[in-house]
A protein has these predicted regions:
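Compositionally biased terminal segments of proteins
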Residues: 1-164
């Protein structure tokens, strides 16, 4: 995230990061983890983004109409077991969450609210397939059991559908 005077640390997560990590899917917004949501919202508002009434965490690009969801780095937005990473990398280019970070965020979000965060589990399944992720993919211990369960179920389905 940039302004004329300062470049801010940020991390792109969500559907856009899923696309950048190997699974193309449509998303109508961009989720960005920032160190300070209020400051980021103020900077983006000054840069021409429209503040969304009723939400302290979203702004909309006036030209493209893309909604930007600002997420609190080091904090959480739901009851999942992991906190969001605190972005420290500063770059004029977008910092996209790597595969490990993205899968951890998605699994944590799903575990915290499985009925309303089902897309997060679907994203993890798609990422496992698209990246041919191994069974022993190293993840935070708070989410690794769920990853192992999902990976095992996927392999079971593959074996069943291939007739083995």
């Amino acid at each position: 995230m940039c302004s004329r005077r300062r470049i801010y640390s940020s991390l792109i997560v969500g559907g856009y990061a899923v696309q950048e990590n190997g699974y193309a899917r449509f998303t109508s917004n961009v989720d960005i983890v920032v160190p300070n949501v209020a400051e980021a919202r103020d900077v983006l508002s000054i840069k021409g983004f429209r503040e969304n009434p009723g939400s302290s965490m979203t702004v909309t690009d006036r030209i493209s109409k893309v909604e930007v969801v600002l997420l609190p780095g080091g904090g959480s937005v739901g009851p999942g077991p992991l906190k969001l990473p605190l972005p420290i990398a500063v770059s004029p280019q977008p910092n996209i969450a790597d595969l490990r970070t993205l899968v951890e965020i998605k699994l944590s979000s799903y575990l915290g609210s499985p009925m309303s965060r089902n897309q997060d589990l679907s994203d993890v399944i798609a990422l496992i397939k698209a990246n041919q992720m191994p069974e022993n993919f190293e993840l935070n211990s708070a989410v690794s059991p769920k990853y192992a369960e999902v990976w095992s179920e996927l392999k079971h389905e593959e074996r069943s559908s291939s007739g083995n």
